[in-house]
């Protein structure tokens, strides 16, 4: 069975702080002569089996502010023993009036698969998934492009974009 990390472990002390809920920047957080990825990212875990993720798909590429979109991804146990996997969903608002994090964990699903078995994991993305507090401390969902990211941990992700009108 797979156990997963609730935190990220940096490669070295020079890579601190290692977090993802930060403001985006044109410069990013880059270190010269160093690998920028954490040694063990949030959600990383070891298992006696392996899993393969298909490409994420959306029920529609556009939604209204009060609508919803269904994201689905196929996960397959490619190993020789049964195992558990935690599929994580992250969201990024690509352009907003308030600075938003690069990625936010907005959902996860635990699944159990036998060897060779595959399952389609679905997430409903709606107003509650996309809302945030604006400068007037009002909950809002702004129209624009959003990126949904899905995968087993915070760095091994596949993304897909959609538009909120």
Language model features with spans:
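Secreted, periplasmic, or luminal enzymes acting at the cell surface/secretory milieu
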Residues: 2-84, 90, 148-151, 165
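Surface-exposed loops/turns
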Residues: 65, 115, 142-143
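Terminal connector regions
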Residues: 126-165
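Short, conserved secondary-structure segments in the cores of folded domains
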Residues: 59, 107-109, 137
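Intrinsic-disorder/low-complexity, polar/charged segments enriched in Ser/Thr/Lys/Arg/Asp/Glu/Gln
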Residues: 68-70, 118-122, 157-159
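Intrinsically disordered, low-complexity Pro/Gly/Ser/Thr-rich segments with frequent PxxP/GP/PP motifs
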Residues: 97-133
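Short acidic, flexible loop segments centered on an aromatic residue
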Residues: 80-97, 103-105
């Amino acid at each position: 069975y797979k156990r997963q990390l609730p935190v990220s472990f940096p490669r070295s002390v020079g890579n601190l702080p290692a977090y993802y809920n930060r403001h985006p920047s044109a410069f990013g957080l880059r270190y010269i002569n160093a690998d920028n990825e954490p040694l063990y990212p949030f959600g990383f875990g070891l298992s006696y089996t392996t899993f393969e993720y298909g490409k994420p798909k959306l029920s529609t590429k556009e939604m209204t502010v009060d609508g919803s979109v269904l994201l689905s991804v196929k996960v397959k146990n490619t190993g020789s023993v049964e195992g558990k996997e935690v599929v994580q969903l992250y969201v990024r608002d690509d352009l907003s009036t308030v600075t938003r994090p690069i990625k936010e964990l907005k959902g996860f699903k635990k699944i159990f698969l036998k060897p060779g078995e595959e399952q389609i994991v679905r997430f409903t993305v709606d107003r509650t998934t996309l809302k945030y507090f604006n400068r007037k401390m009002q909950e809002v969902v702004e129209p624009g492009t959003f990126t949904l990211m899905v995968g087993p941990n915070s760095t091994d992700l596949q993304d897909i974009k959609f538009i909120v009108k």
